[in-house]
Amino acid sequence: QERLERQTRLFTQSVFDSTLPACVIEAAMANLTVLKSTTCFRIENGHFFGFEGSLENVGSCPGNCTHVWYYAQAMAYLFPELERNMRETDFLRETDDQGVMQFRAMRELNGKSWNFIPAVDGQMGTIARLYREWKISGDDAFLKALWPKALLALECGIRLWDTDEDGVLDGCMHVDYDVEFYGVNPLGNLCYLAALRSAEEMARYLGDEEHEKRYHILFESASAKADSMMWNGEYYEQILEDVDQYKYQHGKGILADQLMGQYYAHLLGLGYLMNPEHIK
């Protein structure tokens, strides 16, 4: 307890004494409080779980929702062991033999699988998060244990959303907005590109030449084609023959988070996922 209190105070003092702008410090430290709130908890066996948030007296939306926690970074850097435990849950306990990753980890909470269509940003994003956890920890045993299920998850995504394997996702994609996007869209495709690059790098390190080559070729094809299809001269847009065919499509609109895959690529040193001038 004394060690935890000492390190916590030192961390807090270091942040507030830094040269970061006051608005950045306030935003970062305010959001860190979620980690010590009722949003986060551990069960008897030590496994970590988190709601999407907390209501007045109950948690809101359980099960480490992959396409919500995909946006979080703090725990991976402050409490990396807990974050690695989440990846173990995602891949070892919530990804089936077909590669379908349930985006809510419910098996240990109520004994039942969530049994919903997979989320493109959650499933592809969790592959990038696996790469992040390994880079932070350097734990080769951790990576090797999760790698087979990561391969299944990525190949499942290709089957579901890139049915013609031209490298561009255009299937029915459940996303963080709790809707399905159709056609070629920036949110899904940037998450996919980040997953391909992450998988390529992990395969290279593990000596898996077959998958390293496969994901490199897919990435090169996907990057060029997705960029040319979605770039309208000013920004990336959703490509859909009839934007009114389905509800909740954004079409020529811009999503605030449509470049989340690139955000991860920058954090992980993976470079630009599509034309750098367009991304900028």
Language-model segments: what does each one mean?
Residues 1-2, 210:
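Short cytoplasmic-facing helical segments at TM-TM junctions of multi-pass membrane proteins
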Residues 2-159, 165, 170-174, 251-279:
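Substrate-binding groove/exosite segments of carbohydrate-active enzymes
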Residues 155, 166-231:
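Hydrophobic, small-residue-rich alpha-helical packing segments that form membrane-like cores
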Residues 200-206, 217-280:
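Carbohydrate-active enzyme catalytic cores, enriched for enzymes
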